[in-house]
């Protein structure tokens, strides 16, 4: 948990709004991480939230989404080829948040690089969540998951 004011925008021409990217390329990148076909989920999830894509040399190399939640803003999913890209996406995504609002990110423990990033960002653990899947969703590349899409019902 942190606040937007803790970070300045990171300028990078590879960071683009979702509407400047071919959706098929985004789906292709997403399929490198998880085997479940997520076209419908992605279309519905992304159309109602702010999404940035890291698009470099004609390839999607990461993307992230931020949305308002009950207690601030939630980032997720945050998928990237490496920690540097995840960091740039995260810092640019949170610029959409109200300056004093809390920022949340659900980080999977299966990616040690994501935990290092959270430490670098000085985020504090506020809760622990269990991840469950239906229909045997398989993660192919856990090293690319820096934040998961979560929907909290309380």
Q: What residue ranges belong to the model's regions?
A:
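Intrinsically disordered, low-complexity, positively biased terminal segments
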Residues: 16-154
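Conserved N-terminal entry element of GNAT/NAT acetyltransferase domains
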Residues: 2-20
């Amino acid at each position: 948990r942190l606040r937007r004011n803790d970070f300045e925008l990171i300028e990078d021409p590879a960071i683009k709004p979702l509407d400047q990217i071919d959706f098929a390329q985004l789906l292709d990148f997403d399929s490198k991480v998880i085997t479940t076909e997520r076209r419908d989920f992605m279309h519905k999830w992304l159309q109602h939230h702010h999404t940035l894509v890291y698009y470099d040399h004609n390839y999607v190399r990461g993307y992230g989404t931020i949305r308002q939640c009950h207690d601030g803003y939630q980032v997720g999913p945050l998928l990237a080829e490496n920690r540097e890209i995840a960091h740039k996406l995260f810092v640019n995504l949170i610029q959409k948040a109200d300056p004093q609002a809390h920022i949340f990110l659900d980080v999977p423990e299966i990616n040690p690089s994501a935990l290092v990033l959270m430490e670098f960002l000085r985020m504090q653990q506020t809760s622990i969540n269990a991840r469950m899947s239906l229909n045997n969703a398989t993660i192919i590349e856990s090293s690319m998951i820096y934040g998961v899409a979560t929907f909290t019902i309380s």
